[in-house]
Regions:
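Hydrophobic beta-strand positions in extracellular immunoglobulin-like domains
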Residues: 210-212, 261, 378
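Secreted, periplasmic, or luminal enzymes acting at the cell surface/secretory milieu
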Residues: 99-219, 225-227, 251-253, 280-294, ...
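Acidic/polar, compositionally biased interaction segments
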Residues: 1-45, 78, 235-239, 247, ...
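Hydrophobic helix-and-loop "lid/oligomerization" segment in the mid-to-C-terminal part
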Residues: 38-111
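Short, surface-exposed ligand- or partner-binding patches at beta-edge/loop junctions that are enriched
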Residues: 260-291
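Intrinsically disordered, low-complexity Pro/Gly/Ser/Thr-rich segments with frequent PxxP/GP/PP motifs
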Residues: 232-271
Length: 400
């Protein structure tokens, strides 16, 4: 048997009226499962007799995919995986309709069925829309707006919110994925041709042509990405700079697609000057059908600012670091920020229990002549053991 818990972790019992109640003094009720009808077996028998099977699985936006519910795994519910496995074994013409508002790790599911159709939840026309796409009445042209990973091992600790250091999202993840950001299939194919790029006042203009090389009319979602080469800081591998869904392109038809990228959209926050800057240098623009299906690319030089250099004779705020390891940003005094050592999942308010050593790195301190004596002033809130290390063997240890 098994017991039940309420949402606030209290045991459940059955009262005299036969209703579920929360335990106060009563012992928790013990329940047993009695199988009246095996739904999976019934689905399997039905699948054996059918020409095609449509298996609808996924999540519910008011139960397990609502706000405040954190998943502990990317996997599908085991019962759903087992259902598809048994139905697909009974009928190889099984199409899975996955209703989901977030990514799943469905690599094994992908091997079991010939087609998977993804749709977000909601909408009273959901059924009609799915039917139109499955029958070819409407062109399939949806694109995933998140990266779909192979497994939980591809992600860092769920308490680690740093997408750069944790290498999350299409911008920083550098390994193979199940479905890349922007991915989606169509009933036809497209070629990309004649990319052009030019600078205008305050913006970059990018254009290309797409050609329907298939036999059916369809839509294509053309995506523009950008990457800053040789940046002082770690910039995204690719960053979406624009996209356009081009509707109803007939076979052999050619359409022109135009993008305008404002220069301020290429800025990043510079921790040295503590403001947004447009870094000068070489920018790579890429056009494609997804973040990993790049068809055309060109580079262009953009005039901007040189990345800053740190002045050793001015105060550098502790939270204006270039890199870190095992550190938290936290509340300081008088509304300021501070940095404290800790690991993902630690409570930064319990600094005495954060026992790991942390590292902060500040690049590009420039001395215009070699100093004979170096004085470093550090401001700390609590007793700490601090070691300052430079590139040329400079090491200072202080215990405030």
């Amino acid at each position: 048997g098994f017991t039940l818990e309420s949402w606030n972790k209290k045991q459940v019992f059955v009262d005299k009226a036969g209703y579920f109640s929360i335990c106060v003094d009563n012992p928790a009720a013990e329940f047993e499962i009695e199988i009246v009808k095996d739904g999976k077996k019934a689905a399997e028998k039905t699948a054996e007799k059918a020409d095609y099977v449509v298996a609808v699985i996924g999540c519910d936006p008011v139960i397990n995919s609502k706000e405040e519910v954190d998943r502990t795994t990317l996997g599908l519910p085991p019962e759903q995986e087992e259902l598809v496995k048994e139905v697909a074994a009974a009928n190889h013409n099984t199409i899975v309709v996955l209703i989901s508002n977030y990514p799943y790790a469905i690599g094994e599911l992908q091997k079991q069925v010939p087609a998977i159709l993804l749709s977000a939840s909601g909408s009273q026309e959901l059924g009609h829309g799915i039917a139109d796409v499955m029958t070819g009445k409407a062109s399939a042209a949806g694109r995933v707006n998140m990266t779909w990973y192979h497994s939980d091992e591809d992600l860092p600790d769920m308490n680690d919110y740093d997408i750069i250091q944790g290498k999350r999202t299409y911008q920083y993840f550098d390994r193979e994925v199940l479905y890349p950001f922007g991915y989606g299939m169509s009933y036809t194919t497209f070629s990309y041709e004649k990319m052009q790029i030019k600078k205008e006042r305050g913006c970059i203009k990018v254009s290309c042509f797409i050609r329907n090389t298939g036999e059916k009319t369809g839509d294509e979602v053309v995506q523009l990405y950008v990457h800053k080469k040789d940046s002082r800081v770690k910039r995204p591998i690719k960053q979406l700079a624009g996209f356009e869904r081009v509707h109803n392109i007939k076979p052999k038809e050619v359409r022109k697609v135009n993008f305008t990228v404002q220069l301020w959209e290429l800025e990043y926050y510079d921790v040295i000057s503590e403001r947004m800057i447009l870094e000068d240098g070489n920018y790579q623009f890429m056009v494609g059908a997804s973040s990993q299906d790049i068809r055309l690319e060109q580079s262009i030089m953009i005039d901007g600012l040189h990345a800053g250099k740190r002045n050793p004779f001015q105060t550098t705020a502790a939270d204006c670091y270039d890199a870190y390891d095992h550190m938290f940003l936290h509340r300081g005094i008088n509304g300021s920020s501070c940095v404290i050592p800790g690991s993902a999942g630690d409570d930064p308010d319990m600094i005495g229990e954060c026992l790991v050593e942390g590292t902060l790195i500040y690049h590009d301190f420039v001395f215009y002549k070699k100093p004979r004596k170096l004085n470093i002033t550090l401001k700390v809130l609590e007793t700490a053991h601090i070691t300052v290390t430079g590139e040329n063997g400079v090491q200072i240890t202080a215990e405030p």
